[in-house]
Amino acid sequence: MINIVMLSDSNYEYQIRNFIRSLEYAKIQDYRLFYYSIGFDSTIDNPKVIKINWPKDGRRFDFYKPEVCLNTLNYTKENLYFFDADILVSKRFSRFPARYGSSYPLFCTSGVQHPYTFTIDGNGNQTDFNEKNLMNYLGVSERSMDYVLACFFTFDENCRDFLEEYKSFCKNEYMLSKGMHYYAFTDETPANVLLWKKGIRDNYGRKFVNTHKFSTFKVCEENNNIKKTLIDDNFYEQCEDSSEVYFYHGTKVKEENEKILKYIDENS
């Protein structure tokens, strides 16, 4: 049995429903889904879904990630997968090469290795934000490995200490009050910097595709020979190897989702 952890606020519960439909498409039957509904009562009715109403505070719900993972360790201590709500799994997901036993979660690498965001003030001056401020704050001089995305990771009881430290950053009122200065990409920034701080070099590599488009989903599902390709020449839709695409991240556009779900239903 695999144990899945997900969370959302009330606006994104529909994505959890879509994810469950993708599990059926991938023929994943032996699972439990620990679903944390942030500040509301879920209306999902599924015997495989364990619904947990989690209290809401002023943070973005991304920052609840490590604490709900820690809470799930009270239910089960092995074979755990965390997924963001905007993910659909591939038909290949049953073959995902999950590994456990390390003292840290295992993530997938990002196609964008130096992401940044920015603000522009009233005079048109741009200020960029990335992981550098948090690295400097923690005395981390360099990366130990490539940048990873926090949309997915595997973990077990051995990761508890890492998750506790990760949680401490995601609940740190001082750091949170500084906004993008320290956390350019919400919980993902401290996840990366903590991995580098510990000198960790292990990850899954690139095992997914970022996309909101049905056409990208379909072409990757139906072909195993797409290698090192920017789909539609889009830098954000990088496909390293379609035979090892196990899920799709960023599936948020309603019209495109409806096409994907129709395809899933027709091929389940």
Where are these regions (language model features)?
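Glycine-rich, basic loop-to-helix element that forms the pyrophosphate-binding segment
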Residues: F61-C69
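Amphipathic alpha-helical segments that form well-ordered structural scaffolds
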Residues: N18, S22-Y25, V68, D187-K197
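N-terminal anchoring/stem segment of glycosyltransferases
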Residues: M1-F61, N74-E78, K252-S268
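Short beta-alpha junction loops
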Residues: S37-D41, I87, G111-Q113
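A glycosyltransferase accessory/donor-loop signature
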Residues: Y137-L149, E157-S268
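Conserved donor-nucleotide/metal-binding helix-loop-beta segment in metal-dependent transferases, i.e.
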Residues: V89-F129
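PAPS-dependent sulfotransferase catalytic domain
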Residues: P115, T119-F152, E188-T189
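Short beta-strand-to-loop acidic/aromatic patch adjacent to the donor-nucleotide binding site
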Residues: K77-D86
